[in-house]
Amino acid sequence: MPSTKVAALSAVLALASTVAGHGYVQNIVIDGESYSGYIVTQFPYESNPPAVIGWATTATDLGYVDPTEYTNADIICHKNATPGALSAPVAAGGTVELQWTTWPDSHHGPVISYLANCNGNCSTVDKTKLDFVKIDASGLIDDTTVPGTWASDQLIAANNSWTVTIPETIAPGNYVLRHEIIALHSAENTDGAQNYPQCINLEITGSGTASPTGTPGEELYTPTDPGILVNIYQSLSTYVIPGPTLWSGAANNAVASATAAASATATPTTLVTSVASATDSPSTVAPASSTTATSVLTSVVPSVTSFVPVVTVTDVVTVTTVITTTVF
C-alpha cells in the first residue's frame, strides 16, 4: 500500500513538472505598452476568451513541435494555431519585448525571430501563405564549458524575456512576428530537437520601403540541419543557427552569427550584424485595415504556476529513495 501511494505521488509530481517546466509568451511590451499573449493554460477552457494579439494554439500541455513535423503547418505558429484577433501598433525601429512565463535552464538552444507580411488583415490570414524573414537570431554564445552558454540562457537571465527590434527599413503593413526557442538538450538524437514557436500580430508603421523575400514556415528547417541535429554535450567548434540567412536589413543588434562559431580558445564569439539595404526589390506597402489593440490587457495574465497538484496521503509512509523528476 505505501509503495503504491509513493508511486502515485511520483507520477503526479512528474506531470506537474512537465506542465510547469515549458513556457510560452504570456505578455508583450511594445514601446512601453503591454499586450496580452494567448494564455494557453487558461483561454482554451473559457467560453469567451478575450481578443488578443497572440495566436491561439491547442498546445495546452506546453509541448513542442519536433522535426517530424517540419513540413506540417504546426511548425508555423505551434499546434493548430489560429490568428490573433487584434494587432499591436509598432513603429519601424521600435522594440518588441516578448515575456515568457518561464523557461527550463536545461533546455539550451537558439532564440530566433521572423517577420511575415500578411498582405492584408492578419486576423484572417492563411498561415500557410506567410513567408518569413529572419530579423533576429542568437545561438551559442560561449563554449567555455559544456554544454555552453546559449541564447536561451540569456533569455532566462533577462527575466525570461527577449527583445526584438523591428527593422527601420521594413515597409509599413500588417505582419506576423514569429518568435521561437529551439531546445537542443536531446538534439543529438534524430528528431530530438524541440521547437517552441509563438506568433503575434503587429501593425508596423513608418516610411520604409523594403519588402524582403521570405520563406514559407514549412520550409524553414529540415531534420538534418546542422543546427537541428547536434550534440551540445560535446565541445562545439561551430554552431550554425537553423533557418534562412539573417536579413541584411535586420536591426544592428549583437547576435550570434548564423555561420560563426565559438572560438577554439573558448572565447565567446559575438558578431554584430551591420544594417544594410535589402537586396530584394523594394516596394511601398500600405497597411490594410486591421483591428488594433489599444488597451493594456493585464487582467488576463495568470500566475505562471497555473497547475499545482494537491496530493493527500493518509498513511504514514517512509521514503528511503530520493525521487527526482525530469522536464522533457
From Swiss-Prot:
Belongs to the polysaccharide monooxygenase AA9 family. InterPro entries: AA9, AA9_LPMO. This is AA9 family lytic polysaccharide monooxygenase A. The modification Methylhistidine is found at residue 22. The lineage of its organism: Eukaryota, Fungi, Dikarya, Ascomycota, Pezizomycotina. GO terms for biological process: cellulose catabolic process. The catalytically essential N-terminal histidine His-22 is post-translationally modified by methylation to prevent protonation of the histidine side chain, and protect the critical active site of the enzyme from oxidative damage. CDD domains: LPMO_AA9. The extra C-terminal domain (residues 249 to 328) participates in protein stabilization and protects the enzyme from thermal unfolding. It is found in: Secreted. One of its GO terms (cellular component) is extracellular region. Binds 1 copper ion per subunit. The keyword Magnesium does not apply. Keywords: Carbohydrate metabolism, Cellulose degradation, Disulfide bond, Glycoprotein, Methylation, Monooxygenase, Oxidoreductase, Polysaccharide degradation, Secreted, Signal. The gene is lpmo1. It comes from the Eukaryota.
